[in-house]
């Protein structure tokens, strides 16, 4: 699963502005999907079991789940 650290690293390692823009767009799209989709509910449940402030933890988890597929699509990896 991609993490927010992976996004930061991808931005630091991107060698063109186009790649940086693609990573930023992937993050924004993942963030939008996180607030709309089923990942959010699943992550809310997971966060509440961990006893963390669940709205932030769930949003972060859902964004990371969505980023995993988006970033792998950008680089053609799984």
From Swiss-Prot:
A GO-annotated cellular component: viral nucleocapsid
Transmembrane segments: none
Superkingdom field: Viruses
UniProt subcellular location: Virion
Keywords linked to the UniProt accession: DNA-binding, Viral nucleoprotein, Virion
A Gene Ontology molecular function term of the record: DNA binding
Role of this protein: Completely wraps the viral circular dsDNA genome to form a nucleoprotein filament. These interactions between the viral genome and the nucleocapsid proteins probably maintain the DNA in A-form. This certainly protects the viral DNA under conditions such as the extreme desiccation of its host.
Assembly notes: Homodimer.
Name of this protein: Nucleocapsid VP1
